Amino acid sequence: MKTAAPPAPAARLSGPDRWLPLWILLAMAAGLLLGQQVPGLSTALDGLQVAGVSLPIAVGLLVMMYPVLAKVRYTQTGAVLRDRKLMVTSLILNWVLSPALMFALAWIFLPDLPDYRTGLIIVGLARCIAMVMIWNDLACGDREAAAVLVALNSVFQVVAFGALGWFYLQVLPGWLGLSVTSAEFSLTAITVSVLVFLGIPLLAGALSRVAGERIRGRDWYEGTFLPRIGPWALYGLLFTIAVLFALQGTQVIARPLDVARIAVPLVVYFLVVFAAGMLLGRILDLGYARTATLAFTAAGNNFELAIAVAVGTFGVTSGQALAGVVGPLIEVPILVALVYAALWARRFFPTPYSPAVSPSLSPTAKDRP
């Protein structure tokens, strides 16, 4: 019996999201031009700080993260939590193998650039909690499993990100006889940044879902409220990138080879982690949908959080922040390509694709079981 083929990934995106790589490139170009053409802009933006954190960057990050976290169904954890193979494998990939791989790649490719190396290590610690939902839907992954893994990663990041940053930037390099991060690195600063930039939108998203469903019902919340706030995630992302590139424009233009060197380990990281997730899911017989979810939640990184931590800890014009800024430029095209790779790999999984249960980017309550 011939099975239906899933629709092309590009056809499953809304108009603005379909052109996301282009919007990101335009935001970067706009930021670079503004930084070069408007005298004193970088100084003015850098002066807008609260508690040592850039106010424009903070606003952009919070606006971007809230809509995505408001989509998560925090109460539906039972069935997925009972899938021990998925949960254990996800935890190992996300919190053991992926940070260790990024640590190794950062030292292999950037041994002479400590600021960029530190930025990449921070990126490796920030597990994706935003765009992964889109990649998962495009690849026909398990939406509820993605929601659970995103929620768990969100909570785990609030609790453990600071300690892991301290371990990979100070403890492990010391054990291996490598140079450690400068004394300016602060475990407290990392933890505060995570609590502010992840904890606030996480709490706001959870409270919004509880209050929205209780007052107006799930149909209204998912069919009306979420579509209204959804575009603001893109606006916040583009605003943040534009501001960062306005601040970093001189460095980007002056050091294109450094930017290229930052990009290389990121590409290797995405490909290796995604392949590991798909292979482990196939070996463990998780089924295609949950395997795709496992691979994308492991491969994607929360560059928004990494940028926030780098900016809050090392400064808005630091090399660490630049390493985080390069992230979205590399992540978006690579993960779009991996969506196609996942759909191609679908033929190697026993469960046939079913259009009746394929996820959509803008689900309503009636689409849910």
Locations of regions flagged by a protein language model:
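Alpha-helical transmembrane segments of multi-pass small-molecule/ion transporters
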Residues: M1-A70, T75-A298, F303-P369
